[in-house]
Amino acid sequence: MDRLRQRADFLAVANGTRGNSAAFVVQGRPRDDDGPIRIGFTVTKKNGTATERNRIRRRLRELVKRLDVISMRPHHDYVLVGRRSALTRDFAAMLHDLRSALDRLDRQPPSKAGRNRN
Protein backbone atom coordinates (compact mmCIF):
# COMPACT_ATOMS: atom_id res chain seq x y z
CA MET A 1 0.00 0.00 0.00
CA ASP A 2 1.14 3.49 -0.82
CA ARG A 3 0.13 6.87 0.56
CA LEU A 4 -1.78 9.60 -1.25
CA ARG A 5 0.13 12.85 -0.98
CA GLN A 6 -0.98 15.09 -3.87
CA ARG A 7 -3.98 17.39 -3.46
CA ALA A 8 -5.27 16.40 -6.90
CA ASP A 9 -5.43 12.76 -5.79
CA PHE A 10 -7.42 13.68 -2.66
CA LEU A 11 -9.84 15.72 -4.78
CA ALA A 12 -10.27 12.88 -7.26
CA VAL A 13 -11.13 10.45 -4.46
CA ALA A 14 -13.61 12.97 -3.01
CA ASN A 15 -15.67 12.55 -6.20
CA GLY A 16 -15.94 8.79 -5.62
CA THR A 17 -18.14 6.84 -3.24
CA ARG A 18 -18.18 7.33 0.51
CA GLY A 19 -19.02 5.41 3.63
CA ASN A 20 -19.74 7.08 6.97
CA SER A 21 -18.80 6.02 10.45
CA ALA A 22 -18.93 7.64 13.86
CA ALA A 23 -15.18 8.28 13.89
CA PHE A 24 -14.38 8.84 10.22
CA VAL A 25 -15.59 8.99 6.63
CA VAL A 26 -14.10 6.63 4.06
CA GLN A 27 -13.95 7.82 0.47
CA GLY A 28 -13.00 5.43 -2.32
CA ARG A 29 -12.41 5.55 -6.06
CA PRO A 30 -11.19 2.98 -8.61
CA ARG A 31 -8.10 3.79 -10.68
CA ASP A 32 -7.32 2.89 -14.28
CA ASP A 33 -3.72 1.84 -13.67
CA ASP A 34 -2.36 -1.37 -12.14
CA GLY A 35 -0.66 0.30 -9.18
CA PRO A 36 -1.03 -0.70 -5.54
CA ILE A 37 -3.79 0.45 -3.21
CA ARG A 38 -3.18 4.04 -2.13
CA ILE A 39 -4.51 5.56 1.10
CA GLY A 40 -4.67 9.15 2.31
CA PHE A 41 -5.54 10.57 5.72
CA THR A 42 -6.94 13.98 6.50
CA VAL A 43 -8.38 15.76 9.52
CA THR A 44 -9.83 19.26 9.32
CA LYS A 45 -8.98 22.06 11.73
CA LYS A 46 -12.48 22.03 13.20
CA ASN A 47 -11.54 18.73 14.88
CA GLY A 48 -9.23 20.31 17.44
CA THR A 49 -5.71 21.48 18.01
CA ALA A 50 -2.77 20.24 15.96
CA THR A 51 -1.92 17.71 18.67
CA GLU A 52 -5.45 16.28 18.62
CA ARG A 53 -5.56 16.17 14.83
CA ASN A 54 -2.22 14.36 14.73
CA ARG A 55 -3.50 11.83 17.27
CA ILE A 56 -6.59 11.22 15.12
CA ARG A 57 -4.37 10.71 12.05
CA ARG A 58 -2.12 8.29 13.98
CA ARG A 59 -5.14 6.25 15.08
CA LEU A 60 -6.45 6.11 11.50
CA ARG A 61 -3.04 4.99 10.19
CA GLU A 62 -2.91 2.25 12.82
CA LEU A 63 -6.39 1.09 11.80
CA VAL A 64 -5.23 0.62 8.23
CA LYS A 65 -2.07 -1.21 9.37
CA ARG A 66 -4.19 -3.70 11.32
CA LEU A 67 -6.76 -4.11 8.58
CA ASP A 68 -6.52 -7.16 6.36
CA VAL A 69 -5.73 -6.07 2.81
CA ILE A 70 -8.53 -8.29 1.47
CA SER A 71 -11.02 -5.72 2.81
CA MET A 72 -9.75 -3.20 0.25
CA ARG A 73 -10.11 -3.54 -3.49
CA PRO A 74 -6.97 -3.59 -5.65
CA HIS A 75 -6.31 -0.61 -7.95
CA HIS A 76 -8.34 1.74 -5.73
CA ASP A 77 -7.57 4.94 -3.85
CA TYR A 78 -9.02 5.54 -0.39
CA VAL A 79 -9.13 8.59 1.87
CA LEU A 80 -10.01 8.44 5.56
CA VAL A 81 -11.38 11.74 6.85
CA GLY A 82 -11.06 11.77 10.62
CA ARG A 83 -13.73 13.05 12.99
CA ARG A 84 -13.27 14.25 16.54
CA SER A 85 -14.90 11.13 18.01
CA ALA A 86 -11.90 9.13 16.73
CA LEU A 87 -10.04 10.41 19.79
CA THR A 88 -12.30 8.60 22.26
CA ARG A 89 -13.92 5.77 20.30
CA ASP A 90 -12.86 2.23 21.18
CA PHE A 91 -10.18 1.01 18.76
CA ALA A 92 -11.82 -2.39 18.17
CA ALA A 93 -15.10 -0.64 17.35
CA MET A 94 -13.28 1.64 14.91
CA LEU A 95 -11.70 -1.36 13.19
CA HIS A 96 -15.15 -2.95 12.82
CA ASP A 97 -16.50 0.37 11.52
CA LEU A 98 -13.73 0.54 8.91
CA ARG A 99 -14.42 -2.99 7.67
CA SER A 100 -18.16 -2.31 7.37
CA ALA A 101 -17.60 1.08 5.70
CA LEU A 102 -15.32 -0.54 3.10
CA ASP A 103 -17.94 -3.22 2.54
CA ARG A 104 -20.60 -0.54 1.99
CA LEU A 105 -18.29 1.21 -0.49
CA ASP A 106 -18.06 -1.99 -2.51
CA ARG A 107 -21.84 -2.25 -2.72
CA GLN A 108 -22.47 1.39 -3.72
CA PRO A 109 -22.78 2.28 -7.39
CA PRO A 110 -20.08 4.68 -8.64
CA SER A 111 -21.08 8.31 -8.27
CA LYS A 112 -21.45 10.62 -11.24
CA ALA A 113 -18.05 11.66 -12.58
CA GLY A 114 -17.23 15.32 -12.59
CA ARG A 115 -19.67 16.22 -9.83
CA ASN A 116 -18.72 19.58 -8.33
CA ARG A 117 -18.82 19.90 -4.54
CA ASN A 118 -18.73 23.54 -3.55
Locate predicted features:
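Positively charged, solvent-exposed patches that mediate nucleic-acid binding
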Residues: M1-N118
